[in-house]
């Protein structure tokens, strides 16, 4: 649906395009400052990357994109908002994460560092030495990590983190740990970077996800991830913010007059939406690199997944990929344009802990793997084979399957170019390029800002890209 012609007499202080977590966070911050704000969203519902739908059968509530939210509950901005008053309830599984192995056991990321370490045999001491400082000072670390690269507020803690984060995930795992269990666990955590695990900087996301699991958990949203967007939207309305859905904005010239415009879009979309950008800036946008895509599968099940390792039933998130070596090979191949028969699979089983997700006596689950950007290869059989590998009899539980290839993810969310759910490559080069400018959010067109996950601090349902972009806009207005 295209936005109807807008009355030229309409105006407001701020306009935001895109009602995903970053767009809504930006709108909330602007409204808190007393600005009149209007948000335009192309889809009929708010949420962007946090949406929930009955993809398989009636009564089965599937998270279409993001499903588990360690950075949502940890967000320095979102946690200051009264989202619980507007329907957001976090549910924690007993353990944040399970990583089953072929020997029939599972490596568990527990809420307790000590309990996790005990599961790592001879690497218990090394694990505690690596992780405990970050967990102890989690709030300080999160505050510095979830913002543009700058002088840290807590230099001692950040330097300790940075010395390890700058390393490759595989290099850190092989140096710090001697056994296969700890190495496999960290490989799975590092794979959230969507980078080759032997590339510098890939350890950073692994460390953040690990520390978050201990400090704040990896919760799911009761009723579905959609509740996050709905709660943000509801709170925005209490601040007199307006949201217009079903409004596709192809050009900022379609928008009402405003003092500032914030765009929750990626660089290629920005290029199409804004006229008059300097040639050099246009060339930079055209050179912007998107990362691998995702191939996602959702299942309606007639019972819980029959894991060989019973511990897997204690975690809402399960990593399926086996050893460090297997995961490194799978993720590296994606960057060379290859598909693997044994992909690293990130699986969520929300209905084990949230009964609102499936009809009584039934269950749902979802999983995805990384694929080359824009891939047209159907990975369903390979994903299901990885589940079956650690849960024999899984296929017999499937009632209905729904596939979400990269093309469908992009159709449902225009920011997912080629199925890239992160908004671009999340590597050190991009971090430095975007953070060493005067502002990574401001464009050369006065009053126009970008607030998507293509800006620092990058991917994740934390709203901090939107928050920092709004702060930059407010600074200009003042």
Give residue ranges: language-model regions.
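N-terminal glycine-rich phosphate/pyrophosphate-binding loop and immediately adjacent elements
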Residues: 6-139, 425
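Active-site-proximal substrate-binding core of FAD-dependent oxidoreductases
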Residues: 476-478
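Mid-domain catalytic core of redox enzymes
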Residues: 241, 245-358
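A glycine-rich dinucleotide-binding beta-alpha-beta segment and adjacent secondary-structure elements
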Residues: 179-196, 341-346, 393-456
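Conserved FAD/dinucleotide-binding core of flavoprotein oxidoreductases
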Residues: 115-118, 268-274, 300-302, 359-386
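Helical element adjacent to the flavin cofactor pocket in flavoenzyme catalytic cores
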Residues: 208-250
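Rossmann-like flavin
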Residues: 102-200
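A conserved FAD-binding loop/helix module that cradles the flavin
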Residues: 451-474
């Amino acid at each position: 649906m295209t936005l109807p012609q807008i009355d030229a007499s309409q105006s407001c202080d701020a306009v935001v395009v895109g009602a995903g977590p970053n767009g809504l966070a930006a709108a909330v911050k602007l409204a808190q400052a007393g600005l009149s704000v209007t948000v335009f969203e192309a889809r009929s519902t708010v949420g962007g990357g946090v949406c929930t739908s009955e993809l398989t059968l009636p009564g089965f509530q599937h998270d279409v994109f993001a499903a588990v939210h360690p950075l949502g509950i940890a967000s320095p901005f979102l946690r200051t908002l009264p989202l619980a008053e507007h329907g957001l309830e976090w549910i924690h599984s007993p353990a944040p994460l399970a990583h089953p192995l072929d020997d029939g056991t599972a490596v568990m990321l527990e809420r307790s560092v000590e309990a996790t370490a005990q599961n790592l045999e001879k690497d218990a001491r090394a694990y505690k030495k690596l992780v405990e400082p970050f967990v102890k000072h989690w709030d300080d670390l999160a505050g510095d990590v979830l913002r543009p690269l700058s002088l840290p507020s807590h230099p001692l803690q950040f330097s300790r983190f940075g010395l390890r984060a700058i390393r490759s995930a595989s290099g850190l795992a092989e140096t710090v740990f001697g056994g296969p269990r700890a190495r496999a666990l960290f490989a799975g955590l590092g794979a959230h970077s969507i980078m080759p695990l032997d590339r510098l900087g890939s350890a950073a996301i692994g460390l953040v996800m690990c520390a978050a699991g201990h400090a704040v958990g990896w919760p799911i949203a009761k009723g579905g991830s959609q509740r996050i967007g709905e709660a943000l939207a509801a709170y925005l309305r209490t601040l007199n913010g307006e949201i217009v859905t079903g409004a596709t904005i192809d050009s900022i010239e379609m928008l009402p007059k405003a003092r500032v415009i914030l765009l929750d879009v990626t660089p290629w979309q920005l290029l199409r939406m804004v006229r008059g950008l300097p040639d050099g800036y246009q060339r930079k946008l055209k050179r912007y690199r998107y990362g691998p895509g995702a191939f996602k599968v959702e299942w309606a099940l007639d019972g819980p997944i029959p894991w060989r390792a019973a511990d897997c039933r204690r975690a809402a998130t399960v990593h399926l990929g086996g050893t460090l070596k297997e995961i490194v090979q799978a993720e590296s191949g994606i960057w060379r344009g290859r598909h693997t028969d044994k992909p690293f699979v990130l699986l969520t089983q929300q209905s084990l802990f949230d009964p609102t997700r499936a009809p009584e006596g039934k269950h749902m689950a979802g999983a995805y793997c990384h694929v080359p950007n824009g891939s047209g290869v159907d990975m369903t059989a390979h994903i299901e084979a990885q589940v079956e590998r650690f849960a024999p009899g899984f296929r017999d539980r499937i009632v209905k399957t729904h596939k979400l290839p990269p093309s469908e993810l992009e159709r449902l969310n225009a920011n997912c170019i080629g199925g890239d759910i992160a908004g671009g490559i999340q590597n050190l080069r991009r971090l430095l390029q975007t953070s060493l400018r005067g502002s990574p959010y401001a464009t050369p067109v006065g009053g126009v800002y970008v607030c998507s996950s293509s800006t620092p601090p990058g991917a994740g349902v934390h709203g901090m890209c939107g928050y920092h972009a709004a702060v930059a806009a407010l600074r200009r207005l003042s």
